[in-house]
Amino acid sequence: LTSLILLVAVQAITEEDLELLRQTSAECKTESGVSEDVIKRARKGDLEDDPKLKMQLLCIFKALEIVAESGEIEADTFKEKLTRVTNDDEESEKIVEKCTVTEDTPEDTAFEVTKCVLKDKPNFFGDLFV
């Protein structure tokens, strides 16, 4: 689940952004130890309640500064990065309002945010997210 993206609505995702996201995802995969099968299913929107997948998501969210060290979602950063993908400030705002949650652990928070985003936008993250 490699990731949401950076910056404001007027700026689109660049090849450099995509490469950074791929690199971050690969580094997080090494750190989390999540299996390729779990990642493949996650790319299709089938998120397993897997501790390693949750670690993967949290790692990516931290790298993108979507999650603070405290484990809370940084709503402004989350919206900024979403807007790079959606190119729609209003849509991003709705997603952030709906999907910004705080669970018992930072891993669970990242997992639940991801599930929420994918409910409305099943292909939102595509091959990047994990």
Curated annotation (Swiss-Prot):
One of its GO terms (molecular function) is odorant binding. N-glycosylated. SMART domains: PhBP. Residues 1-12 form the signal peptide. GO terms for cellular component: extracellular space. Its main location: secreted. It is found in: Secreted. CDD domains: PBP_GOBP. SUPFAM superfamilies: Insect pheromone/odorant-binding proteins (SSF47565). PANTHER family: GEO07291P1-RELATED, ODORANT BINDING PROTEIN-RELATED. May be a carrier protein for lipids. This is B1 protein. The lineage of its organism: Eukaryota, Metazoa, Ecdysozoa, Arthropoda, Hexapoda.
